[in-house]
Amino acid sequence: MPLIFKIGYNVIPLQDVILPTPSSKVLKYLIQSGKLLPSLNNLITSRDKYKPIFISHLGLNQRRIFQTNGNLKTISRGSKLSSTIAFSTQVNVLPELDEGVFETIYGKFHITIESVEIVEVEKLKEEVEKHMNDNIRVRFISPTLLSSKVLLPPSLSERYKRVNAGYSTLPSVGLIVAYAYNVYCNLIGKKEVEVRAFKFGVISNALSRIIGYDLHPVTIVIGEDSKGNLRKARGVMGWIEFDIPDEKLKRRALRYLLASSYLGIGRSRGIGFGEIKLEFIKREENH
């Protein structure tokens, strides 16, 4: 079974800087220029839809920085920003862990390592058993882009391939866990899982119990097109709490969601969208 690496960074600008959109581009630039974790460049450039890498937006005061309009975000010199990179690779990246002052096209930054976590995917099963009697709360830390077309029967997905239905701003349990399933399958090397993801999502919708939610849509800037126009998308933030009474199904959902708590869910995880946090709520706490 593969390993998941999660590295937390402190990122301090040494001058006033205008952050790029999305702000994850700062660390992405350092990887692609070979200055930080150069072995991850192949993962970044991969066209694989569910590739096992997540680069967070920069964070300030425990909130991720992302653009919701045309206004660029200016950060003052000396501000303590944070970032997380999570990935799975066969390469030994530990010798590549580095700190120091780095020049980027966005400014000069002092970068230090805050934390390093290495998780054996096989051992996620042990974590699953700890929470079988809990409700599951999925909290969206950054705007999350979930296409409901994931729940189309595979026989119809090709027919509606060109229909732009946007992203769900009120995602169902089935949609969330279907995306997590796809991330997990890619992580362990299982291919051609569209039919299974569809079935798993539909069954999870039918057999889940929603306890509560606080979800809201957010329009975010995800970059620029070839003409310099802003590319926008509508995603979701907030949280949803649910339970799955069927034990076998819940065990699977927990395993997939635990992997996604490192690698994110939805579109554009490689640039910071779809960051989630799992919270577990004792059933007796709910009235």
Swiss-Prot record:
Description of how the protein assembles with itself and partners: Part of the aCascade ribonucleoprotein complex, minimally composed of Csa2 and Cas5a, which binds crRNA. Other possible components of aCascade in strain P1 are Cas6b (SSO1437) and Csa5 (SSO1443), while SSO1399, Cas5b (SSO1400) and SSO1401 have sometimes been seen weakly associated. Csa2 is probably the major RNA-binding subunit. The Csa2-Cas5a-crRNA complex also binds target DNA homologous to crRNA, probably forming an R-loop. Purified aCascade forms a filament about 6 nm in width.
- Which GO biological process annotations does it have? defense response to virus
**Keyword Transmembrane annotated:** no
Per the record, the domain of life is Archaea
So what does this one do? CRISPR (clustered regularly interspaced short palindromic repeat) is an adaptive immune system that provides protection against mobile genetic elements (viruses, transposable elements and conjugative plasmids). CRISPR clusters contain spacers, sequences complementary to antecedent mobile elements, and target invading nucleic acids. CRISPR clusters are transcribed and processed into CRISPR RNA (crRNA).
Name of the protein: CRISPR-associated endoribonuclease Cas6 1
A GO term, aspect molecular function: endonuclease activity
